[in-house]
């Protein structure tokens, strides 16, 4: 039990409402151009939308043909709805194939989306 919980200072973990994929972001970190099909030189973004107040570590784990190729995490805190964006990067372009992004909140998998580079 969190001692400061008695004083109302502990915050609950965030709940992921939606996971968006696309090639362009809006100013509020939501996806402007939704897609699950990309070209090798496209930018690839995942936007994690939360609808409640809370604080958590959100991670994006990117895989290609079943092998993890990138992972990034951020500590975030929101008072109400929020969006956290992650960019999947490749300096030389993405190989053609099947990909997946998995979202973890405080180390626990909560959402995933498959996508394709063609």
Predicted regions: what is each one?
Residues 75-77, 115-118:
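Short beta-strand edge segments in extracellular beta-sheet folds
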Residues 60-66, 103:
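Conserved aromatic beta-strand anchor motif in extracellular beta-sandwich/beta-rich domains
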Residues 69-79:
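Solvent-exposed serine/threonine-rich low-complexity stretches and specific carbohydrate-binding patches
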Residues 78-88:
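Aromatic sugar-binding surface patches on proteins
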Residues 91-117:
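Short, exposed beta-strand-loop hairpins at the edges of beta-sheets
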Residues 43-51:
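Short edge beta-strand/loop segments characteristic of extracellular beta-sandwich folds
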Residues 11-40:
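Short, compositionally biased P/S/T/A/G/V-rich stretches that sit at domain boundaries
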Residues 6-9:
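C-terminal motif of bacterial Sec signal peptides marking the signal peptidase cleavage site
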